[in-house]
Amino acid sequence: MKLTQLETPEQRIEALEKIVQPFKERAATYDEEGSFPFENFNDLKQSGYPALTVPKKYGGVGISLYEMIRHQETIAIADGSTALSIGWHVGITKHLGETNGWQEEMYAAFATDVVNRGALLNNASTERATGSPTRGGKPETCAKKVDNGWIINGRKTFTTMVPILDYFVVTASIDGTNQVGSFLIERTNDGVSIEETWDSIAMKATGSHDLVLTNAKLKRDHLVAYLKPGHKPAAGWLLHIPACYLGIAKAAQQYAIHFATTYSPSSIQGTISEIPAVQQKLGEMELRKLQCEHFLYSVAKKWDETSEDIRQTMKPELSAVKLSVVNQSIEIVDLAMRIVGARSLSKKNPLQRYYRDVRAGLHNPPMDDMTLSSLATKSIQEHR
């Protein structure tokens, strides 16, 4: 039975836990090869996972933000790269469906494609010259208006999930104006190509290669939105990012607990889990995990239960969740490695992969310095 046919969040979470079990077994191979986990995505598509955040009126399930991050965490425990990748699709799909960000006809066609065949989408915004889109740089990718539509030229970096994407949402400066637009480009468009540039030591299986657009021709209605560089409304869907890194931390914690409760060197009686120094680290991991869960889950539920006006005041809060959970997750993985010791650095040990992958969270948006600045501004305004 597909996830989309199950009635409750609990049923879907339990079913997904079973679906992703093979992901854990495949993760080391994909990481070592730096190859894309097509098998994982085929399993997710077969389960109907890409359609969970499609609104009900288009044939999806329209799950809550809280349920979405629980699912993302579950996938990340099995494989962080797969979780981060699919998280962009389910998050953006949810956001567009809730905000009516595109014309009805355009979103309906996309949503139907997701429901019928598991079509996948991601934003393509980052460029080498402009850096992170969150800092407001104007894209060098250019869209030129022609009689029957648009011609787009440019290159986007860090296009996560690009080996399997069906749709790209590309930011481009509109030629002859000061405007920036968001354009929907299908993979089958002429002028669309991929250059395999992804050589990161973290999240190696995300396939975050370059998207190259060479005289890509689009219909006029594929300009789906106008953007204001640097202006980012509150986006609850971005909580898929901290959910992913918390999942990686939980995988590391589970490994460390298993090791501590089964490893019994000849120098002691019992296992190392009974040694006070190890118990301190186990306790600290659990404390940090609980703090992450409560912060992440409570803010997600607040988003689900509040009005759009209140949601737009939550930007500092959402950013704080990302900063806190990612940094706490890094500490959890570090503690796990201290418990396991030097063997955690073995190429065969999953902890070394968790260590590399969890640090990638520092470079996902929003950046820590911008979050702290926004929190400072918030505290000053509230003091007045």
Question: Where is each model-derived feature located?
Answer:
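Amphipathic alpha-helices that form helix-helix packing interfaces
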Residues: 242, 249, 256, 285, ...
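Glycine-rich beta->alpha junctions and the first turn(s) of the following alpha-helix
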Residues: 200-289
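Glycine-rich phosphate/cofactor-binding loops in nucleotide/flavin-utilizing enzymes
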Residues: 340-384
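C-terminal helix-coil-helix/basic helical segment that borders enzyme active sites and/or dimer interfaces
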Residues: 24, 28-31, 290-324, 337-340, ...
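A short core secondary-structure module
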Residues: 155-192
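Basic/polar N-terminal segments that are highly enriched at the extreme N-terminus
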Residues: 1-14, 18, 384
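Glycine-rich phosphate/pyrophosphate-binding beta-alpha loops
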Residues: 158-161, 237-240, 364
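Glycine-rich flavin
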Residues: 36-46, 51-153, 160
